């Protein structure tokens, strides 16, 4: 089941916008119908860059969950929870920090990138340096097999894999490991045991990944061995020991090209967003203020859509016939910029009107939201507690 478990989260540092909707939430909607999905509000992570800001986290957390529900995240098939409601995240983060080399954290690309991007903030903190390790703990504590990320986040998943590999190497070599592994093999039956031994030998002698995949699949099919035996034999294939914290895989998602009001990527940091909660009047005002091709000083001046931020929004929201109409009208000066912007205003309102209707419904029932958070957090914590029992036992602190 763990290889079918997906985990993803968001920091509650402000209102969700169309960039979140197109870049993350639409992916979540597809994933929740295919995987065992865990979606969490990463409230501790909010402090990594906003530790000195007076942000109303309680409001942001509640509004974030309301917005998730309004776009269609279903608590009946997805586990929705809040990071701080599962304190085991912090415990695993602490224990992993004992064996994670400092250089691993310093080389994460986003460490220096974010320092440059947010140069008005003092990010020379232990929390900011260590936040990728907290992300690793977030993932590993649920033994999530898949983490949906864009290409810019793959390095974080690679770090998580290295952290898990190191932990398993240090603490997975239990006393009499080989003897216990051989006993587990004998429980598989002669034919299956022979296949396992053959695949293990092939992998260890040649490094054949196909043999590793087949051996892992063989273990998943076994009914006569315990979960502990399965994890032990999984590590025995690779010669590392019992797999306590499985290594996750990146689930690459299609990058959102959602542009902001100024043509840059839509981001709160750039102040160029359209919120999921913006009124029709606010949407119209924001779109109408958007800059256009500077060559179009007068209505009779021809323009170039490729030099206009508005065109980027047409590529997201407009069909081919509308896009053709825009190109024709702009390049031949047959329409003004106000006229060009109207289809975008209409399209955004069409998307947001039903979402905002559902936001109003959920907002009117705060007790329901609290109950969803409570139940999801309790479910998540029960999984996290099981992982921490294994971790403490492996590290010898289960007294």
For the regions a language model picked out, list residue spans one by one.
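N-terminal Rossmann-like or analogous alpha/beta NTP/dinucleotide-binding catalytic cores
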Residues: 2-7, 12-137, 158, 162-164, ...
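Active-site-adjacent beta-strand anchor residues
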Residues: 82, 150, 277
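Aromatic-acidic/polar surface patches that form glycan- and anion
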Residues: 57, 126, 149, 153, ...
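Conserved nucleotide- and phosphate/pyrophosphate-binding catalytic cores
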Residues: 18, 155, 161-399
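Flexible, glycine/proline-enriched loop segments at strand-loop-helix junctions
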Residues: 115-121, 143-154, 272-274
């Amino acid at each position: 089941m763990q290889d079918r478990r997906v985990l993803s989260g968001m920091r509650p540092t402000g209102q969700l916008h169309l960039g979140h909707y197109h870049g993350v939430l639409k992916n979540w909607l597809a994933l929740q119908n295919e995987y065992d999905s865990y979606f969490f509000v990463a409230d501790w992570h909010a402090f990594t860059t906003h530790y000195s800001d007076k942000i109303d986290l309680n409001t942001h957390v509640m509004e974030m969950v309301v917005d998730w529900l309004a776009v269609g995240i279903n608590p009946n098939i997805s586990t929705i929870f809040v990071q701080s409601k599962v304190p085991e995240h912090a415990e695993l983060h602490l224990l992993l920090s004992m064996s994670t080399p400092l250089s691993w954290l310093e080389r994460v690309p986003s460490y220096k990138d974010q320092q440059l991007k947010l140069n008005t903030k003092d990010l020379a903190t232990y929390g900011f340096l260590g936040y990728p390790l907290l992300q690793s703990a977030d993932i590993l504590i649920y033994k999530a097999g898949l983490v949906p990320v864009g290409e810019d986040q793959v390095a974080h998943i690679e770090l998580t894999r290295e952290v898990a590999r190191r932990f398993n190497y240090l603490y997975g070599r239990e006393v009499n490991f080989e003897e216990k592994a051989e006993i587990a093999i004998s429980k598989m039956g002669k034919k299956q045991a022979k296949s396992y031994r053959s695949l293990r030998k092939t992998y260890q002698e040649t490094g054949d990944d196909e043999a590793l995949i087949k051996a892992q699949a063989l273990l998943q099919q076994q009914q006569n061995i315990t979960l502990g035996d399965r994890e032990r034999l999984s590590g025995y294939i690779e010669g590392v020991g019992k797999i306590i914290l499985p290594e996750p895989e990146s689930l690459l998602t299609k990058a959102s090209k959602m542009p902001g009001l100024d043509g840059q990527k839509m981001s709160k940091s750039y102040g160029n967003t359209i919120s999921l909660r913006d009124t029709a009047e606010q949407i119209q005002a924001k779109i109408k203020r958007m800059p256009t091709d500077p060559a179009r000083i007068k209505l009779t001046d021809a323009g170039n859509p490729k030099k206009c931020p508005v065109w980027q929004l047409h590529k997201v929201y407009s069909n081919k016939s509308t896009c053709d109409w825009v190109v024709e009208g702009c390049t031949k000066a047959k329409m003004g910029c106000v006229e060009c912007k109207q289809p975008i205003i209409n399209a955004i309102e069409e998307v947001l009107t039903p979402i905002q209707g559902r936001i109003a419904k959920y907002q009117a029932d705060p007790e329901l939201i609290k109950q969803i958070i409570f139940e999801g957090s309790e479910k998540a914590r029960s999984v996290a507690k099981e992982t921490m029992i294994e971790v403490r036992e492996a590290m010898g602190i289960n007294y």
